[in-house]
Amino acid sequence: NSIMFFMIIFGICALSFNWADFKKIYTVKEVNIYGTTFFDQSIIEEKSNAIMSYNIFNSKLRNYKDEILNFDHIIDCKISRKFPSTIDITIYEREPVALISSDELIILDSEGVCLPVEYCDLSLPILTNFKSNPELYPKGSTTASTNVLNSVILMKYTKDNFSMIYEDISEFVFNEDSEYEIILKNGKTRIILGREKLQNKIKYLSLFQETLKEEKNIKDFKYIDLRYNDQIIVKEA
């Protein structure tokens, strides 16, 4: 009797799914994309069009996730079903923090991973006068340049803790004296950091900005020299 009971239940379920398929209840009609903050969402939308009209139970959704993960700028993605006919896609992106020019322009994320620029149109600081050998910047992998990686870490630190300064940076320069400089977006302010304790120098720059209050701004200076202990040397524009 118990076998007969389970056979009846199985038959009812099978008939239900066949009926639902016949009525197209479980056909994907909507795809929602979340989490695209830094990069162009249209490349995900193009791929999502391919799963419209799929049955929501279709095992090919796993293949679709693998296709998304082929993009270097995506760390992970989660695809979830919202019955009866909606797919939600959550994207986890890499965070772009700087640009560098090798044989082509390259985005560097917060971990120093090299990414293509075609999916991102953000205004980012450019790392200038660093080694440009293409082998130092393998796409989808961490830069092989320790100097560049340390500079990326500094840019990330500045972005997280002193966002107003970060947003004003046009170039981060490794100069001919092997010292680090910042060129602001106004094109006229040069900030000399020196060679060491660079995070502290960014802190000092922020404190200097605070002491100016509303009277002036760091952009009002031609250069700001932070290389020396207990003093800041400035020249007005």
What residues fall within each predicted segment?
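Short polar catalytic/cofactor-binding loops
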Residues: 35-38
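Charged, solvent-exposed interaction patches on well-folded alpha/beta domains
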Residues: 1-32, 42-55, 62-66, 70, ...
